[in-house]
């Protein structure tokens, strides 16, 4: 829970790891780099909001805590692509492993940032740069923009459905499901 009061308005700069690409993410510096990137966005906001009327409370909050929220999307897409049932023990163990990886790597990055650039006021004595590092937010729009992967850690609500958009009705077929159906020769327009 982010702090908010008469004195401060909270901010949290968000991004999500696309878990449809977990096999590439797990052995890379992606989470570390994403955490550094989000902290850089905090600094960019701090720099650009200086003297802007109406942003004083949120700017002060960002200066003192540098809250970021690195989350995830595409978990169900990864499971589908790899033939792992969503409600299986294997999926549960994998989700725990992924969440731990994101938590550990974002903490490692926050500690590195604190050593390199210092701890903000609300983190003094803790050896970290960010009061918050992870946030598993809904990612409906982002997931759609990333090729129609599943939202956050959630399963797709349906496998084939029509969706209203600014350009009209769109037929939505999750990419991993679409590939599996083509593979099995059971998909048709």
Regions found by a protein language model. Give the residues of each.
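Long, C-terminal-biased catalytic regions of enzyme "large/alpha" subunits
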Residues: 1-189
């Amino acid at each position: 829970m982010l702090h908010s009061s008469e004195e401060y308005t909270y901010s949290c700069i968000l991004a999500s790891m696309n878990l449809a690409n977990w096999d590439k993410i797990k052995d890379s510096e992606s989470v570390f780099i994403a955490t550094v990137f989000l902290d850089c966005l905090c600094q960019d906001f701090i720099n650009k909001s200086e003297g802007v009327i109406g942003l004083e409370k949120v700017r002060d909050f960002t200066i003192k805590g540098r809250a970021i929220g690195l989350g995830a999307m595409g978990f169900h897409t990864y499971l589908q692509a790899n033939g792992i049932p969503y409600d299986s023990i294997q999926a549960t163990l994998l989700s725990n492993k992924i969440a731990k990886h994101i938590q550990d790597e974002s903490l490692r990055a926050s500690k590195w940032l604190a050593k390199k650039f210092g701890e903000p006021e609300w983190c003094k004595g803790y050896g970290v740069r960010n009061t918050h590092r992870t946030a598993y937010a809904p990612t409906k729009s982002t997931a759609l923009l990333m090729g129609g992967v599943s939202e956050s850690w959630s399963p797709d609500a349906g496998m084939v459905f029509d969706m209203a958009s600014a350009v009209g009705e769109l037929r939505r077929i999750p990419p991993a499901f679409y590939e599996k159906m083509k593979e099995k020769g059971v998909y048709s327009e």
